[in-house]
């Protein structure tokens, strides 16, 4: 009988501890504009890899092209009972001279998230192919060091209309 109570205590402690560790996060953390511009300055996939994993992203695929390599990371999230996959692509030139960060999601309104952070940037005319699409609304910004494209694309989903948000950050 002496061993019964401590055994029950430890079993309950183990069950409650594991329950607390498995709760699903209700927040979906995205990097700030300052963080995105810092990453674009890295020109190093290794440094980027360490920091993006801290936000819950996992490496998915590496794609080599003629002048650059793209590293794609994904994060699966559930918000209000709906499953989403966030994607971030780190593209770096083969000579490590430039890099571009591209983030695509439907889980969070990136326009609302990033617009207040872009007050120090100049709003410029968008010349990107995405901005010319009639279903896409884009705002383009520039500072002395970076160019940022922020888009809200109306897409037809199988269960109705939805938004797909896109932000791209490049060092000038």
Residues covered by each model-derived region:
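Hydrophobic, Leu/Ile/Phe/Ala-enriched alpha-helical segments that form helix-helix packing faces
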Residues: 13, 48-59, 117-125
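Long, charged/polar, surface-exposed segments that mediate recognition or autoinhibition
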Residues: 83-141
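Short, exposed beta-strand-loop hairpins at the edges of beta-sheets
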Residues: 145-162
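Short, low-complexity, Pro/Ser/Thr/Gly-rich segments in the mature regions of secreted, periplasmic
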Residues: 158-172
């Amino acid at each position: 009988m002496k061993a019964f109570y401590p055994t029950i205590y430890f079993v309950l402690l183990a069950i409650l501890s594991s329950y607390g560790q498995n709760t699903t996060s209700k927040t979906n953390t995205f990097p700030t504009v300052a963080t995105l511009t810092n990453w674009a300055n890295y020109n190093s996939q290794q440094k980027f890899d360490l920091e993006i994993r801290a936000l819950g992203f996992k490496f998915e695929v590496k794609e080599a092209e003629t002048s650059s390599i793209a590293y794609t990371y994904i994060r699966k999230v559930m918000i209000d009972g709906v499953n989403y996959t966030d994607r971030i692509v780190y593209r770096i030139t083969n000579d490590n001279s430039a890099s571009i960060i591209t983030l695509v999601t439907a889980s969070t309104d990136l326009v609302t998230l990033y617009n207040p952070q872009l007050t120090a940037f100049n709003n410029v005319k968008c010349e990107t192919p995405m901005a010319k699409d009639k279903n896409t609304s884009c705002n383009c910004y520039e500072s002395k060091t970076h160019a940022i494209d922020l888009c809200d694309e109306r897409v037809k989903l199988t269960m109705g209309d939805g938004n797909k948000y896109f932000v791209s950050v490049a060092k000038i």
